[in-house]
Swiss-Prot record:
This is Probable exo-1,4-beta-xylosidase bxlB. InterPro entries: BXL, Fn3-like, Glyco_hydro_3_C, Glyco_hydro_3_C_sf, Glyco_hydro_3_N, Glyco_hydro_3_N_sf, Glycoside_hydrolase_SF, Ig-like_fold. Its main location: secreted. It is an enzyme of class 3 (hydrolase). It comes from Aspergillus oryzae (strain ATCC 42149 / RIB 40) (Yellow koji mold).
Length: 797
C-alpha cells in the first residue's frame, strides 16, 4: 500500500504543544531534547579552579590585582616539566599537585553550541539543547553584517552559559573563514562564501559578537579563526588534506587566501587561530614560522596578551607521518612549537616534547611562552577569578534558547534564502492541498549541516505547511543519492491529488562534509528524473534546493514546468517555517548567492588541487572575479518586487594616491575609508522587500594583468522598502578595496579610471572616478619561504 500521508489537523491543534508528532508515520517537527537522537550526555561539574581555599590559591595566578601575563607566568613557573608538557594537549590534564583542574580546549560553536569533545548536552532538562542557527553559507547569503553580530552574540551567550554550567569550556574553535574557492569542497557549507571582502566583513562582525567587542580585556568567550591557511581540500580523487601541499603564489595568497585572516587577527583581534592540515608551498602550516610568526604575529601585529595558536586535530602528527617534513614525532613536535604553535589537538606534544627537549630541538623558554599564551587567555576569560568579579559568570540556563534567540534564528534563515527562479508561481495561494515530495520533505537533523548541537525543535516543511493552513500529501519519492525509482509512482500519485507540488531535495552531508569533497556538481542520484516527471503533470511546481555547495540548476531553470526554485542551504531549526514564510509571501525573498553556481562541466576543466585563481591554459578561472560562464553568478537573487537604482552622482572624486595613502587615523591604511558612495533604491513593484546593494568595481588597464572581471568593494542590506518608496543606501568603500595586489603580494593603490556598478544581471546606471598620482604601496607583503627546510634538522630522509 503506497505511503501517501494526508494530514488533517483539528481546530484545537494550536492549543496543544506538539513538537514531535507521528501521524500515520509522518514527522512534523522533531523535539530533540530527548534520547531518541542519541546525543552524548556526560555528568558535569564546575570547570573553574578553586582560587579561594585550594592549593592554587597560594599561586599568583589567583591574584586579580596582577595583569594576565604575570598571573600566567606565575602558574607556569610553578609547574614541573612533566606538568608543562601534559598541558600542551587539547584535553589538558591540569596539575592536581597545584590545584589546577583539567581543561578541554576543544569546543565548537559553528552555528550554535555544538555537541562533542569539550561540550556535553544533558539527556533532558537544563542544557539539553541550544539555539541552532542556519549554517554560515546561508547566513552569508543574507549579506547583513548587523545580523551576523547578533547571531554571534546569542551563540556566545549560550556558549558561556554552557561553560558556567559545567558543560563546556570557554574557548570555541570557530569560525571557518577559508574562502569557498572550489565548488567541490566538502566544507564550503561552513563558510560565508567565496568573496574575500565578504568573508572579512563577516568574520569581523562575528568575532565582535562572539568575544563581546574588538580586543576586549575580558572576552565573553574566545573565538578561533581557522584554518590558517590555504585550506580547502578534504579528500578529492584520493588526495587527502593531511598530505596535501597547497602551492600558492604570493599574489593569490595575499589577495585571496589571507584577507579574512588578516581582518580576523589584525583588525578584529581574535584571541586564537588554528593552523591547518595542509602544507603551504612545501611547509606544513603548523610548522611554518613564516606563517605563524613573521606574518601573523609580527606583520599583522597579533602579539597581544593571550593570543594563541592551536594545531588542527592531528595536524602536528601529519608533519612527519603524512607530509614527511621531518623524520619523527620529536622533530615534528619541536618544529611546530618553534614555529609558534602553542597547543596540540592531538598527542604529539605530550608524547614527544620530552624527547625533543632532551635532543636540544627546542628550549624551555619556547615551551613556557606557549603555556603563558594559553593561560593568559584563560586569565582574561576570568577562569581564575571569583564568580562575583566576573561579568559573564552569572549567565545561566535561563539565557539559552530564549524567545529572542528563537526569533533571531528564524529571521536569519529567512534573510538568507535565495530565490533563483519564479515565473509567477510564488507566492503560493493560501490554503488548498500541497504535495511535499523529496528527501528533504520531512527532514529534521538533516537541515542542520555539520558541527551542530541539538535544538529544542526543528521545524520541517510539513510542519510549516500544516501550520500555514494547508492540507499535506507527503511522499519521499527518492533518496538523496539513489538510482531506485521504486518511490516515483507514490510521489506522482501524491502530486496528482494536490493543488501545488513542492519538491525538497539537493545535497546533504552524505554528499558534502568534512573529509569528503565532491567529484561532480550535479544533482545526485535520480532527483532530476523525479522532478522532470513531476513537471510533466502541469501543476504549479516549486523546487526547494538544500545543501551548502551549489549544484548545476541549468535543467531546472530551462524547464517551463518548474515554476519556482529556491536555495535554502542548511537552515537548521527554523528551516521549514522560514521556507514557508518565503513560499507564502509572509516574507519577501532578498538573499543573494554567496558563491558562483558553476556548470557541471567545470569540474572537468580544473583539478581541485590547482590553487590558482586567475585563468590560464589549464584553468578557466575561479570565482566571479575570474570566471564568466556561470549558470548563476555570485550575488544573484530574485525578489517578489522590482527595484530601480540611481546614483547621487555620476562621477566621484577626483582622488590622488598621495592623499588617499596618507591615511587619517592610526588604523592600517587599507582599512581607512576611501569614500562613501550613495545610491537611491526605489521599490517599483507591489511588495515590500529588503534589497541587498552589491557594489562592484571594474578597472581595466589598472594594475597588473590579467584584470578581474569585477570586484566586490561594498554591500549593504536595505530593510523593508515599501512599494513606491525609496531609500538612500550608503556604501562605504575602504582604501584596500580599491587597491590591487601585485605579483609579489604587495597591496598597491594604482592611478587610473575606475567604474562602479550595482547588482548582478541588472542594467542599472554606473558611476566613475579617477585616481591620479603615482603607484602607492599600502602594505608590503613579507616574502614567503619557498620549500624551506624545517625549523629543526631533518633526519632519516
Amino acid at each position: 500500500m503506497p505511503l501517501i500521508c494526508i494530514v488533517y489537523f483539528l481546530q484545537y491543534l494550536d492549543k496543544i504543544a506538539i513538537s514531535y508528532a507521528s501521524v500515520t508515520g509522518l514527522r512534523e517537527s522533531a523535539n530533540l531534547h530527548g534520547n531518541q537522537f542519541n546525543w552524548v550526555s556526560t555528568s558535569t561539574e564546575s570547570i573553574f579552579p578553586d582560587c579561594s581555599t585550594g592549593p592554587l590559591s597560594k599561586n599568583n595566578v589567583c591574584d586579580t590585582s596582577l595583569d594576565p601575563v604575570s598571573r600566567a607566568k606565575s602558574l607556569v613557573a610553578a609547574m614541573t616539566l612533566e606538568e608543562k608538557i601534559n598541558n600542551t594537549k587539547y584535553d589538558s590534564s591540569g596539575a592536581p599537585r597545584l590545584g589546577l583542574p583539567a581543561y578541554n580546549w576543544w569546543n565548537e560553536a559553528l552555528h550554535g553550541v555544538a555537541e562533542g569533545h569539550g561540550v556535553s548536552f544533558s539527556d533532558s532538562g537544563n542544557f539539553s539543547y541550544a539555539t541552532s542557527f542556519p549554517m554560515p553559507i546561508l547566513l552569508g547569503a543574507a549579506f547583513d553584517d548587523d545580523l551576523v553580530k547578533q547571531v554571534a552574540t546569542v551563540i556566545s551567550t549560550e556558549a558561556r552559559a554552557f561553560a558556567n554550567g559545567g558543560h563546556a569550556g570557554l574557548d570555541y574553535w570557530t569560525p571557518n573563514i577559508n574562502p569557498f574557492r572550489d565548488p567541490r569542497w566538502g566544507r564550503g557549507q561552513e563558510t560565508p562564501g567565496e568573496d574575500p571582502l565578504h568573508l572579512s566583513r563577516y568574520v569581523y562582525h562575528l568575532v565582535d559578537g562572539l568575544q563581546d567587542g574588538i580586543g576586549p580585556e575580558r572576552p565573553k568567550v574566545v573565538a578561533t579563526c581557522k584554518h590558517f591557511a590555504a585550506y580547502d581540500l578534504e579528500n578529492w580523487e584520493g588526495i587527502e588534506r593531511y598530505a596535501f601541499d597547497a602551492v600558492v603564489s604570493p599574489q593569490d595568497l595575499s589577495e585571496y587566501y589571507l584577507p579574512s585572516f588578516k581582518t580576523c587577527t589584525r583588525d578584529a583581534k581574535v584571541d586564537a587561530v588554528m593552523c591547518s592540515y595542509n602544507s603551504l608551498n612545501g611547509i606544513p602550516t603548523c610548522a611554518d614560522r613564516w606563517l605563524l610568526q613573521t606574518l601573523l604575529r609580527e606583520h599583522w601585529g597579533w602579539e597581544q596578551t593571550g593570543h594563541w595558536v592551536t594545531g588542527d586535530c592531528g595536524a602536528i602528527d601529519n608533519i612527519y607521518a603524512d607530509h614527511h617534513y621531518v623524520a619523527d614525532g620529536a622533530h615534528a613536535a619541536a618544529a611546530a612549537l618553534n614555529a609558534g604553535t602553542d597547543l596540540d589537538c592531538g598527542s604529539v606534544f605530550p608524547e614527544y616534547l620530552g624527547s625533543a627537549l632532551q635532543q636540544g630541538l627546542y628550549n624551555n623558554q619556547t615551551l613556557n611562552n606557549a603555556l603563558i599564551r594559553l593561560y593568559s587567555s584563560l586569565v582574561k576569560l576570568g577562569y581564575f577569578d571569583p564568580a562575583d568579579d566576573q561579568p559573564y559568570r552569572s549567565i545561566g540556563w535561563n539565557e539559552v534558547f530564549t524567545p529572542a534567540a528563537e526569533e533571531l534564528a528564524h529571521k536569519a534563515t529567512v534573510e538568507g534564502i535565495v530565490m533563483l527562479k519564479n515565473d509567477g508561481t510564488l507566492p503560493l495561494k493560501s490554503n488548498g492541498t500541497v504535495a511535499i515530495i523529496g528527501p528533504f520533505a520531512n527532514a529534521t537533523t538533516q537541515l542542520q549541516g555539520n558541527y551542530e548541537g541539538p535544538p529544542k525543535y526543528i521545524r520541517t516543511l510539513i510542519w510549516a505547511a500544516v501550520h500555514n493552513g494547508y492540507k499535506v500529501k507527503f511522499s519521499q519519492g527518492t533518496d538523496i543519492n539513489s538510482n531506485s525509482s521504486a518511490g516515483f509512482a507514490e510521489a506522482i500519485s501524491a502530486a496528482k491529488e494536490a493543488d501545488t507540488v513542492i519538491y525538497a531535495g539537493g545535497i546533504d552531508n552524505t554528499i558534502e562534509k568534512e573529509s569528503q569533497d565532491r567529484t561532480t556538481i550535479v544533482w545526485p542520484g535520480n532527483q532530476l528524473d523525479l522532478i522532470e516527471q513531476l513537471s510533466d503533470l502541469e501543476k504549479p511546481l516549486i523546487v526547494v534546493q538544500f545543501g551548502g555547495g551549489q549544484v548545476d540548476d541549468s535543467s531546472l531553470l530551462a524547464n517551463a514546468g518548474v515554476g519556482a526554485l529556491l536555495w535554502a542551504g542548511y537552515p537548521s531549526q527554523a528551516g521549514g517555517a522560514a521556507v514557508f514564510d518565503i513560499l507564502t509571501g509572509k516574507s519577501a525573498p532578498a538573499g543573494r548567492l554567496p558563491v558562483t553556481q558553476y556548470p557541471a562541466s567545470y569540474v572537468d576543466e580544473v583539478p581541485m588541487t590547482d590553487m590558482t585563481l586567475r585563468p590560464g591554459s589549464n584553468n578557466p578561472g575561479r570565482t566571479y572575479r575570474w570566471y564568466d560562464k556561470a549558470v548563476l553568478p555570485f550575488g544573484f537573487g530574485l525578489h517578489y518586487t522590482t527595484f530601480n537604482v540611481s546614483w547621487n552622482h555620476a562621477e566621484y572624486g577626483p582622488y590622488n594616491t598621495d592623499s588617499v595613502a596618507s591615511g587619517t587615523t592610526n588604523a592600517p591604511v587599507d582599512t581607512e575609508l576611501f569614500d562613501t558612495f550613495s545610491i537611491t533604491v526605489t521599490n517599483t513593484g507591489n511588495v515590500a522587500s529588503d534589497y541587498i546593494a552589491l557594489l562592484f568595481l571594474t578597472a581595466d588597464g589598472v594594475g597588473p594583468e590579467p584584470y578581474p572581471i569585477k570586484t566586490l568593494v561594498g554591500y549593504s542590506r536595505a530593510k523593508g522598502i515599501e512599494p513606491g518608496q525609496s531609500q538612500q543606501v550608503k556604501l562605504d568603500v575602504s582604501v584596500g578595496s580599491v587597491a590591487r595586489t601585485a605579483e609579489n603580494g604587495d597591496l598597491v593603490l594604482y592611478p587610473g579610471s575606475y567604474k562602479l556598478e550595482v547588482d548582478v544581471g541588472q542594467d542599472f546606471p554606473t558611476a566613475t572616478f579617477t585616481v591620479s598620482g603615482k603607484e602607492k604601496v599600502l602594505d608590503e607583503f613579507p616574502e614567503p619561504q619557498q620549500n624551506a627546510t624545517s625549523a629543526v634538522t631533518r633526519r632519516g630522509r
